[in-house]
Amino acid sequence: MNLRPSHPHPARRGPRIAVLGSYGGFNIGDEAILTCVLSCLRARRPGAHLVVLSRNAEHTRAHHPDADEVVPWEGVSRNHVLDVLPGLDLLVLGGGGILYDGEARRYLRLVRAAQTRQVPTFAYAVGAGPLTDAEDRDAVRTVLAEMDDVVVRDEESRLVLEEVGLEREVAVTADPALLLAPEPFTEAMMRDEGIPSGARLVGMSVREPGRAAEKLDEGDYHALLADVADFLVRRLDARVVFLPMERHDVRHAHAVLSHMTAPDQGRILHGDYSPGQVLGFMRHLDVAVGMRLHFVIFAALTGVPVLPLPYSGKVFDFARRLGAPALVGVAREQAGLLLAEVDRLWDEYPQRRDGLRTRMGELCASAQETCERCGSLLDEIGAARGSGGAPAPDEGPSGDGPYRAEPRPLHA
């Protein structure tokens, strides 16, 4: 098996740091997180040898040139993965929502193996919950108690860890993807997607109903979101663009389109785009309505008025911190309330824009705190071992601080 990175780097003499998470191209949000974690580590330790433990090594090699080495950890022998641990100076767990039923124990098994080999471990703005399975709860309680530092991305996750019985300090910061830098999404790319120049655009993110619409069958759920899309088409004289954040979202986007009375006014992005390009695309939008957390984050980063449709605690928590309106859930009989909230979002945004921009600055600064805590731990590790590479100057992961775009002007 070829374990060489796609982008060979000169030998590095800094610390050897491994990053473990749900990486490998399955979800744009997770890929955005990995981009930001690697950028942080490279900014703090330019000479570090960065290893990514990936669920799809080929994808990670191709899309993350900051990684010096990529090692698969699914579908390979346990010994193959354990061979990565000797010589590590730090194992970074996360970020992202990886501590939940059925998955937590899989990640923490490797963290525990690192701990038994005296490798320092750091939880990088992870998300937790739901955690009801006894084996997962025990793994979270025991393994996180022995980590060198535990940082979660929201208050909901801290409360989940507290309920599980974790008795230690847990820092709350914000999602690492808040520090993502945009990449251009050009007019030529817009044409390739069949999106007309100069049109008002509404971005939508849909996924399986989950707890956001637990009383709806799938057909009613799709019909409700189609009502929202049709309303925005009429209200704003706009086109609707669906942004799949992972591949299963495409099916739900097609289903919503099929329920619309004006399906010709809807498009689904079909290209294979990097997280930075998706963030760049958001700058073309006039308003955004969606369920996926990182869709909501990207919209907020670009100053687009956004209505989160929460399906889990992480979206509720982000909407609360952003000060954005957020519905408890969606039900067919509440369609009128949902449409009224969308209408109010559009009308009131000019008055709310400055407050949202201030809150986003605070959230970006909070996300930066995770990077600083990781850098401090690397300082301690280097001091204890008498090396570890020189720290970089104090700067954001991309070298120029968090991205804060001016919003696209609202059309009259």
Short names for language-model regions:
Residues M1-A412:
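Active-site anion-handling motifs in enzyme catalytic cores
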